[in-house]
């Protein structure tokens, strides 16, 4: 209440909170023992869990991932597909469809994140360089049709030829645009933002960093209202960097990812 945690008793019926108040007669009581009860987490950028790689995950594998995530408080996730062959990406999408359409016990798969293939080779990270492309909006349309509208997020490098022209079309397809894996200048990144990009993908990793004479894509992310993906594992970004991001962007613009 008003940004503060309260000591309350919650009445839950069929998995939904009915009200906060006195315990009804005959109700089962679960004592949280002082722990905080919060809404389920949403992991917007994840590539797998418990030994399962999203790029090779069957619907059954995705249930393994979803069960693990739910056990640790994550109730929804987007599956992030690394740049792969068209054949393998299509296979992944079909398996995602199968998982989403079947009864499941674990976290809900709320969308697909295409991390590529429109990424800069110089900042490719783990992406296979020979599969990277400049632009191909028809390919994205094909994937989105196959996914039945399930592609919710894509990461692009703004400096690649033709990528800026793709952004409005991607928005029309219902896809959130993130910028990353990029050596974009400040001006290129700001143009991408003006055209509709709304997320900085794992900011500070696989990205051209700030210089006082060229703030680059990093500076554009920090200055703008973009959401700032932040890998909070203590390795990709040290704790001091995460604290700096939080102060620069404000907590409402930080997206903690795994």
Where are these regions (language model features)?
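Active-site-adjacent C-terminal substructures of enzyme catalytic domains
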Residues: 166, 188-258
């Amino acid at each position: 209440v008003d940004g503060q945690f309260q000591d309350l008793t919650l009445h839950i019926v069929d998995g939904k909170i009915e009200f906060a108040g006195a315990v009804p007669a005959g109700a089962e009581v679960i004592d949280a023992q002082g722990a905080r009860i919060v809404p389920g987490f949403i992991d917007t950028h994840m590539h797998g869990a418990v030994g399962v790689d999203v790029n090779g995950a069957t619907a059954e594998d995705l249930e393994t991932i979803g069960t693990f995530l739910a056990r640790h408080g994550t109730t929804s996730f987007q599956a992030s597909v690394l740049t792969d062959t068209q054949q393998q990406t299509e296979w992944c999408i079909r398996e995602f469809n199968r998982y989403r359409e079947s009864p499941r016990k674990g976290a809900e798969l709320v969308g697909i994140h295409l991390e590529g293939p429109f990424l800069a080779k110089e900042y490719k990270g783990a992406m296979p360089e020979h599969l990277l492309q400049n632009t191909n909006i028809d390919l994205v349309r094909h994937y989105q049709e196959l996914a039945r509208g399930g592609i919710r997020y894509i990461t692009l490098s703004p400096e690649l030829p033709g990528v800026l022209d793709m952004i409005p079309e991607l928005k029309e397809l219902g896809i959130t645009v993130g910028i990353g894996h990029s050596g974009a200048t400040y001006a290129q990144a700001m143009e991408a933002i003006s055209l509709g990009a709304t997320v900085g993908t794992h900011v500070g990793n696989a990205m051209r960093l700030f210089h006082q004479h060229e703030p680059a894509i990093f500076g554009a992310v920090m200055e703008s209202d973009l959401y700032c993906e932040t890998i909070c594992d203590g390795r990709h970004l040290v704790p001091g960097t995460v604290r700096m991001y939080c102060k620069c962007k404000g907590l409402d613009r930080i997206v903690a990812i795994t």
